[in-house]
Amino acid sequence: MDAAEVPEVWAVFDQRSGLVNAPEGVFDRVFESKNASAQVQAALQDAAGPVLLLIDDGDRVDDPMNVFDAIVKGDFPDVHIIATGKPTDLRPLYSHWTKAIRKFRTGAVVQPNVDTDMDMFGSIPRRAPVQLSVGRGYAFLAGSPVLVQLMSPEDSQHRGGL
């Protein structure tokens, strides 16, 4: 993706997602989780530039068209995925498209459980230097953790959970 190009932002989510409360116009396109694979595949045929694809609760999004898997493998170089999911829901999905994303060992774990979330992207320190309150956790780049504050409790209340 060229640094000068601003990507379209597409989102995949269902009615249980906090993204349903996003202000109008935040996303260029929105896809329902249940049929997202086919819809995104069709939309990619018309994409005129780079795309940032946000997928909330990726563990609940199937990929019968293998489009998400193809994006992760680099078949669509101008399309990038940011996917969310709970580690306990993602871990048992051995043949799911999200497994390929986890192999990059790059992501974030918010308020991690050190007993169950230790291996999502890399090793989480057993003891945090501060309390891991709302929005706090670790970001990983190639398996190396960095303590982060991704949002504040006030943001969560004002934005309907976003």
Describe the residue ranges of each PLM region.
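P-loop NTPase catalytic phosphate-binding loop
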Residues: 1-103
